[in-house]
Amino acid sequence: MTEISSMVISHKKAKIEEMESAWHGDLDGLLNNLYHHEYVYECVVLKTCNRVEIYVVSPKSSSVLFSFAKEMGASTHIIDFYGHDESLEHLLRLAGGLESMIVGEDQILGQIKDLYAYSKKAGTTGKILDTAFEKAIQVGKRIRNETRINKGSVSIGSAAVDLAEDIFGGLTGKSVLVIGAGEIGVLVAKALAEKDIEAIYIANRTFKKAEEIAYELGGYAVRLDDIRGHLPDADVVISGTGAPHYILTREMIEEALDGRERKLLLIDIANPRDIEESVAELENVELCNIDNLRVISERTLKMRKEEAKKAEAIIQEEIRLLNIQYKRQKADRLISELYRQVYDVRVREREKAVNRLSAYHTIGEIETEVLDDLTHSIVNKILAEPTKVLRQAAELGNEEFLDVVSRVFCLEKDKAKLEKINQAKFEQIEPGCAKEQAAVKEQTAVKEQAVVKEQAAVKD
């Protein structure tokens, strides 16, 4: 049976360097290599900083994916191999943000959209993967609309920015000084740059690093020794250097407050602390440290875990609907082919009738139209009940019944494989491979002749 299978290398089992070593070449190369495998009918590749995932539609999924894992040089201990049902559930969980390092993050949904669109444009997807990925994107949106799984701050850096917004009622027109251009400092600066602030100043021990970040964000670089001169103009100071001593002392803050009446918010995200604790005693100063931010972050994580339960319920509901959709698609394929065959007979027999009548009488447009309507109506009425029965059987999962109908009426004779050989593979073989093209043509002709003989035998 041709279904979806997948292999997943993610942050859950693999280190960053292991994921990087498993990824060779560009996306085009991997997609092309996958799609031109004899037993791969459709494929999509998802590649982000935290995962490499391959989805294929194949009648020999296990052997195909194991061979690709070996080809990629990836150790099987860092890979999860999923069958059809597991692949669908994983994909929907991924789109919903449940598989991310930070539960509920939004970036993954955009990445799925972009990478699916890339594969679709490359021509490596078909009805089965299109249905799965379109459903995943829809579910990702639904989860974010119906739950609060992506709300609140879960990192210390984002919590610092949210806290500043809460205290001031927004950061519009505020001047912010960020001290420290390490990982957290950069994240804070980037989050601040998205706000409508008046100015952002980046101070760092290595001035060149401060200049690079400031240039990227449209801010101003400050030497660490010069921060004293910038404190009087700052509304918010966020410090996270990790230095073994205080960066901001009480004496420095008192000097900055001289002649000033507006509030100064100090947020210390360093460990050990960058700001002397006694500054909290000063008027018009509010000091928050990493412990305050951790409480906000943990509260958000707890909330997101609760929201994840709601997301799980949505996913289970959508998987049920997706399986019904796949079952209907199988019935629709059979019904479409059945109608096509019967309509071919209808057209041929109608033409015979018109020719016979024309031998004895003059047949005009009205008579021809009556015959056309008559045969059309007969076909539709004969097939109405079988159509209903086929759809019901599909929704009930009665695969055996569908297979019997398919064999009796010769509706599916390895159709997907013939189409793949005939269209995709032949058309995409590189120029100059005349022998390969001839071989494909010969294989296709042999198989098509076998199909015609099979149809003729059944009709006889």
Curated annotation (Swiss-Prot):
Q: Where is this site: Important for activity?
A: H90
The name on file for this protein is Glutamyl-tRNA reductase
Signal peptide start-end: none
Q: Which GO terms describe its molecular function?
A: glutamyl-tRNA reductase activity; NADP binding
Organism of derivation:
Methanosarcina acetivorans (strain ATCC 35395 / DSM 2834 / JCM 12185 / C2A)
| Listed pathway(s) | Porphyrin-containing compound metabolism; protoporphyrin-IX biosynthesis; 5-aminolevulinate from L-glutamyl-tRNA(Glu): step 1/2
- Taxonomic lineage from the root: Archaea, Methanobacteriati, Methanobacteriota, Stenosarchaea group, Methanomicrobia
Q: What is the additional note?
A: During catalysis, the active site Cys acts as a nucleophile attacking the alpha-carbonyl group of tRNA-bound glutamate with the formation of a thioester intermediate between enzyme and glutamate, and the concomitant release of tRNA(Glu). The thioester intermediate is finally reduced by direct hydride transfer from NADPH, to form the product GSA.
Q: Name one GO biological process term.
A: protoporphyrinogen IX biosynthetic process from glutamate
Per its UniProt record, what Pfam families does this chain match? Answer: GlutR_dimer, GlutR_N, Shikimate_DH
Copy the domain comment: Possesses an unusual extended V-shaped dimeric structure with each monomer consisting of three distinct domains arranged along a curved 'spinal' alpha-helix. The N-terminal catalytic domain specifically recognizes the glutamate moiety of the substrate. The second domain is the NADPH-binding domain, and the third C-terminal domain is responsible for dimerization.
User: What does the record give as the function of this protein?
Assistant: Catalyzes the NADPH-dependent reduction of glutamyl-tRNA(Glu) to glutamate 1-semialdehyde (GSA).
- The disulfides recorded in the entry are none
